[in-house]
Amino acid sequence: MVKKILGQCYIWLILILMYLPILVLIVFSFTEATNVGTWTGFSWNLYPRLFQDAQIMTALGNTLILAFVSAAVSTVLGTLGAIGAFYSKKRTRKAIDSVTQIPIVNAEIVMALSLTVMFVFLSTYVFKAQLLSFWTLLIGHVVLSLPFVYISVKPKLEQMDPSLYEAAIDLGATPRQALTKVILPETLPGIFSGFLLAITLSLDDFIVTRFTRGAGLLSGDSQIETLSTLVQAKIKKGPIPVEMRALTTIIFLIVVLAVVLISIRRHYVDKKHAQGRVRG
């Protein structure tokens, strides 16, 4: 009984430590106080002010475009890489798995510096032109996210019967049909998880963005600004803009809504599969 109570207390303590700062931020998004901790009265004004701030809206647009494009590219490459490794020889598969683990455990600053050195070398000795741009930033985010997509898809492939592909080919399907009709549907939950994880990594990233960014995508500025780099730049000059509290609240609520919808859909799919097994 005592162990059960202590276990529940420990779980609640972890949850409080995780979500209390977010709840404080949400509460103070409804006041115009400059400093968190000083309540100057309830107000919605931060939310309309957020959408009137051109600098924040540009950074938000850059961040979302970068996140979704890099996630899409990472998902395609990571999924194809996982499928290719799954159907490779055992030694080749182990080698690919090991290589894929390195960027995950490696320090992000090492990856960022390596990409920067590579882009500078190519700019100086190969293309003879400035390369740092939105495209180099996109490459950096794809390199950052791709291994996580790979490890999200890989378990779903391992749960699948490896003979399904050969069976589809034997029944007259082309390799492309076997991939799209058999392999991809079986791995779709892992692909979707990898896609969401890639979006999260891109939205959250600062180090790779700081080292590989170039000209702005939406504003044409000398350097593209994302939310992470904008916050860092604002901190150097003074306090974080109060409108950021409203923005982070909106992002958090969208994430919560997405998680709830995904959980409902997963419950519905699992229930449907269970009913199908009972009928079978």
Q: Residue spans of the language-model regions?
A:
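C-terminal transmembrane helix and the adjacent membrane-cytosol boundary/short C-terminal tail
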Residues: 1-10, 17-20, 154-165, 169, ...
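Periplasmic/extracellular loop-to-transmembrane helix junction in inner-membrane transport proteins
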Residues: 3, 34-70, 233-241
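Cytoplasmic-entry segments and transmembrane alpha-helices of multi-pass inner-membrane transporters
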Residues: 3-11, 80-115, 165, 189, ...
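Transmembrane-helix boundary motif in ABC transporter permease subunits
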Residues: 3-4, 68-100, 120-121, 179, ...
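Transmembrane alpha-helices
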Residues: 10, 15-22, 150-153, 160-162, ...
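Short membrane-interfacial helix/loop motifs at transmembrane-helix boundaries
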Residues: 20-54, 213-222, 278-280
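Membrane-interfacial helix termini and adjacent extracytoplasmic/periplasmic loops
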Residues: 35-37, 44, 109-143, 176, ...
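Interhelical loop and adjacent transmembrane-helix boundary motif
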Residues: 46-55, 203-264
